[in-house]
């Protein structure tokens, strides 16, 4: 007796064949089953495809894979650039520009893999800029992106709103008090570092920028005593200038679960540097607190610096603990010192390259005229009248948009964020706008590759830029390099005034040129996601004849 079951096509299948059956009979049935096997395979594949059709969309509910991707081949980039090491570190900006032309100009987003942060970044078209402008940190957060990108918890602790308050409220709210200090410190450091050489004297562009910005910004952030303390200055400089290098180290490679343990070990030296700098700050805070109890810091005697402003804030006592204040101020020292250094290098290169002959004479004449109205002081009022100098700076930032050619970085904090019916991104997504591409778009800025120092001078303040492709008004974004909207760089007003004072004084005091003879403006170095100025550039300074 044989036992049968009905097969998938209605045929009987012999599960327990009777061993007494003739061998030829069993062979005949096996042959019949083999003929049915293609039908069985086709049916199985059809069922799997049908299941995949229904199940796969649930893994991509926001249709992220439908957002076009711009890929970067290491081999192809090494071939295109003609530089072998691009196989290891492929360029970033050319591919952002490729995506901008292909998608952004058609109001479509695209995505690119950011190897330094091991994340997909969604590059948004300009039409979404007004929507992002006024979003709060509970929806779209710059602060949380910075915290995640820099791995701040590995060195000095996570960022919070205090750092933003220091820039947006304390620095900006005290600009009138800050300006005289900035001017005095600038004059001191120029005399100390450059002096008044009658013959050409050589300086490295980065070393000079570090010395000048450090001397001025350290005074604003940490007070006169610490700004003139060599031990503190050394620790503060090492900490603030290493934030970005420590942020990027090892991030380019996917190390899996070993990534954070290795980063923690690498940040050990940074934590040690932070501890040294912190001791100086906490000792100063303790001294000031003691004087306050003795009523010796009243009225005009109160120091003008970020330490004192932080101590005076109406915040919980635990947030005003000396170590907490020190850590937060050292956090923002990277923004107050490192960021202006990069900007100073870029603008200084533009001054040497483009502010020549009559252009330089025109800028100098305007500065002299405006300062003369205010007894030689770089005040808010005198700087407001320097329209041509302001236009030169705006054009410089248009051509070289700071350290990163992208702006408006946000981490989506809500469960999801709906930009419109075509674009919804989930929590944890990173968005950004292609600043450099926007500012070099010929449909927005005519002749974008030409440095026109009067470009913004000719623009009326009430007019909007117009996109030549669509005829639509484009949101004003002359300073887009500093971000946009509520979460733009809170220290941008301070930074712009700082740079104008330093570089304006340099133009009045010195003739400046590239060492070794005339040359084109040094190109930027593409180090994903950074466009860095060439730190090897050498300059030469000579005091002007009319400077006494």
UniProtKB/Swiss-Prot annotation:
Biotechnology: Aspergilol A shows a weak cytotoxicity toward MCF-7, MDA-MB231, and HepG2 cancer cells lines, with an IC(50) value ranging from 21.21 to 48.76 uM; whereas aspergilol B only shows a weak cytotoxicity against MCF-7 cells, with an IC(50) value of 27.41 uM. None of the aspergilols have antifungal or antibacterial activities.
Highest taxon of source: Eukaryota
Keywords, ordered alphabetically: Heme, Iron, Membrane, Metal-binding, Monooxygenase, Oxidoreductase, Transmembrane, Transmembrane helix
Annotated heme binding sites: 489
Single GO BP term: secondary metabolic process
Subcellular location, principal: membrane
Enzyme class per UniProt: oxidoreductase
Co-factor(s): heme
Entry annotated with the keyword Transmembrane: yes
Described function: Cytochrome P450 monooxygenase; part of the gene cluster that mediates the biosynthesis of aspergiltriene A, aspergildienes A-D and aspergilols A-D. The bifunctional terpene synthase AuAS converts DMAPP and IPP into sesterterpenes. The C-terminal prenyltransferase (PT) domain of AuAS catalyzes formation of GFPP, whereas the N-terminal terpene cyclase (TC) domain catalyzes the cyclization of GFPP into 5 distinct sesterterpenes: aspergiltriene A, aspergildiene A, aspergildiene B, aspergildiene C and aspergildiene D.
Family (UniProt): Belongs to the cytochrome P450 family.
The protein, known as: Aspergilol synthase AuAP450
Species this chain originates from: Aspergillus ustus
Gene from which this protein is expressed: AuAP450
